């Protein structure tokens, strides 16, 4: 059986990228929470 994590930069960016987060209200909430926490990287 193959492993479940088969890395792909494209898929990573499309599902967890900054622009995707900015699209929805919930995504923007995630970014704001990470800003408030002081995360160095907000999104992938």
UniProtKB/Swiss-Prot annotation:
What Gene3D superfamilies would the database entry show? Answer: 1.10.287.3980
Is Ribonucleoprotein among the key words of this record?
yes
Which Cys-Cys disulphide bridges does the record give? none
Q: Which GO terms describe its molecular function?
A: structural constituent of ribosome
Q: Which InterPro entries match?
A: Ribosomal_bL34 (IPR000271), Ribosomal_bL34_CS (IPR020939)
Q: Which domain of life is it from?
A: Bacteria
Query: One cellular component GO annotation, for this chain's record?
Result: ribosome
Q: Which PANTHER family match?
A: LARGE RIBOSOMAL SUBUNIT PROTEIN BL34M, MITOCHONDRIAL RIBOSOMAL PROTEIN 34 FAMILY MEMBER
What's the name of the protein? Answer: Large ribosomal subunit protein bL34
The record lists the organism as Bordetella pertussis (strain Tohama I / ATCC BAA-589 / NCTC 13251)
């Amino acid at each position: 059986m193959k492993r479940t994590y088969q890395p792909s930069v494209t898929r990573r960016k499309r599902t967890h990228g900054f622009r995707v987060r900015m699209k929805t209200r919930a995504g923007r909430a995630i970014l704001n929470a990470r800003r408030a926490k002081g995360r160095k990287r907000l999104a992938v």
